Amino acid sequence: MSNFDPKHFLLHCARKPGVYRMLDAEGGVLYVGKARNLQARLNSYFQKNVASVKTRALVGRIRDIQTTVTGSEVEALLLEQSLIKELKPPYNILLRDDKSYPYIRITRSDRFPRVTFHRGTRRAGSQYFGPYPSGSAVREALSLIEKIFQVRNCSDSYFRNRTRPCLQHQINRCTAPCVGLVSEEDYARQVTMAADFLDGRSREVADQLSTDMEAAAAALEFEKAALLRDQLAAIQAVQQKQYAETGQGDLDVVAIETRHGLAIIEVLMIRDGRILGHRTFRPDTRGEDDRSEILEAFLSQYYLGDREDPVKPQEILLCMEIPGAEALQQALEEQWAKKVRLAWRVRSDRAAWISMAQTNAQQSMATEMAAREHMEARFLALETLLESSEPIRRIECFDISHTQGEKAVASCVVFDQQGARKQDYRYFNVNPAAGGDDYEALEEAIRRRYQRVLKEQGRMPDLLLIDGGKGQMQRGWKVVQELDLHASIRVMGIGKGPSRRPGFEALYLPCGKEMIPGPADSALHLLQQVRDEAHRFALTGHRARRGKARKQSTLDEIPGIGPKRRKALLTHFGGLKQMRNASASEFARVPGINSQMAQTLYDWFHR
């Protein structure tokens, strides 16, 4: 790409709203931005007194700029977010946590509805409550629902195949509708009260339980009255420690804390007048140090992205003013088709909520900084242990997991001075011929990993750690030498020491040196942490691969079962165990399975 002349470009740049894309020498997109006036915004990048280190580094790599004129600043904002999500430019602030919020789901289409954890696309025939700030908040609420209202949480296949009550009934967390211990009418009443409770109408539920209890006592149904009394007491206990009341409506409170290039953003969630909790985000700031710029980028990606969160707050309280607040508010109103208010100058309760969110952000930052300092100290201890003249900033560790050679998986986990870099983790499905040979599997995985890193000019580790003894370490060192990386990558094996006791692991180096640092050594603690994570990641990958293969291989052996029928069977029953317990008539209920195929399936599983 030819040299870029900013002066010539700016002479012909439109003075209208739009989006700009900054390109490098290979045509890759470095940065995507929006502007009310494209010429004025782009001109600001090429001034002599630019203070931002990030901006100066960006400008030094620009070889071309492409622009798209839009009808308004709102359109520019929406297009900008679409391009950032698609292209993930290296100089844009990126929201790394793109996981959708969890909900509680009641399957209203079932004869005996179940109450479950849900994340993702909403399905017809179900009622949803939330969103909740975290999975733990959902599980806590579900535990409370089961304790008070005793509704089922089991899968449909498990429910259909019960012949006697399960443990949930024995510990008074389910009324056992699977075996007819509760009438459909009574169960429906419990589900309705559970839904009302989740909707925040706990007072109404308590009043209803009190009325039912008095009626049962008057009818001399003392066992039923005692059960209702216990339910009422549980709800009253919840009400005493109920979430803080905040008035009606849905709103989010957003606060930011920055320090040493790190940003922490807290989102305090208030739904139906109750503070449900908060969620912490750590956006990749890409060197940006302007708090308002980071906050604006976060808000745009968080609220304008395609997250599956149908509940949109009618008010968003901010800890500070952001430059594009008006355009963001208009974009939200356009996308959500309702009035939305962004506010930062507030009083009374709202000011207290902002203070609460800011306090959470400060606490999260303090915790994060302490963890980073601890990790950095461990890296320094490792450098001292290895007598390294070069800093160690990145460690990659490999481990192999298989069951007697079946479906072997190699894991590669990555750590730097900030901790685990899970976005850089990789699995490698090992060639079946090498599956039972840990040495061959390890060699294959390491070779594939670093051949690709070389090809893509990616980041190499400073230390390659291998879970295993001297033999595994030597195989890893062999591959590093083959790829001519021995001058830049240190290789180390970590295995059980002579005593085979935890904390007395032996470290093996290519030079033949062996070390046993001892259980108090900080460097060993770091290596143990990395090794244990590699082991966990490999085991998780192996179990998933083995389970998938066993499910598919068993069904694939049955005549007449192709991909569509296999998927329908697994969706309906959940697994092979449930299929083995199913009757021919139950197989016939599966979409796409006729009576003849149902009998074939039954005969196959009962050979």
Curated annotation (Swiss-Prot):
Biased amino acid composition, Basic residues: 542-551
Origin species: Alcanivorax borkumensis (strain ATCC 700651 / DSM 11573 / NCIMB 13689 / SK2)
Domain UVR residue range list: 203-238
Family: Belongs to the UvrC family.
Self-association state and partner proteins as the record states: Interacts with UvrB in an incision complex.
Residues annotated as transmembrane: none
Protein purpose: The UvrABC repair system catalyzes the recognition and processing of DNA lesions. UvrC both incises the 5' and 3' sides of the lesion. The N-terminal half is responsible for the 3' incision and the C-terminal half is responsible for the 5' incision.
Protein name stated in the entry: UvrABC system protein C
UniProt cross-references to InterPro entries, sorted A to Z: GIY-YIG_endonuc, GIY-YIG_endonuc_sf, GIY-YIG_UvrC_Cho, Hlx-hairpin-Hlx_DNA-bd_motif, RuvA_2-like, UVR_dom, UVR_dom_sf, UvrABC_protein_C
A Pfam family this chain is assigned to: HHH_5
Subcellular location: Cytoplasm
GO cellular component: a single term: cytoplasm
Keyword hit for Acyltransferase: no
SUPFAM superfamilies xrefs: C-terminal UvrC-binding domain of UvrB (SSF46600), GIY-YIG endonuclease (SSF82771), RuvA domain 2-like (SSF47781)
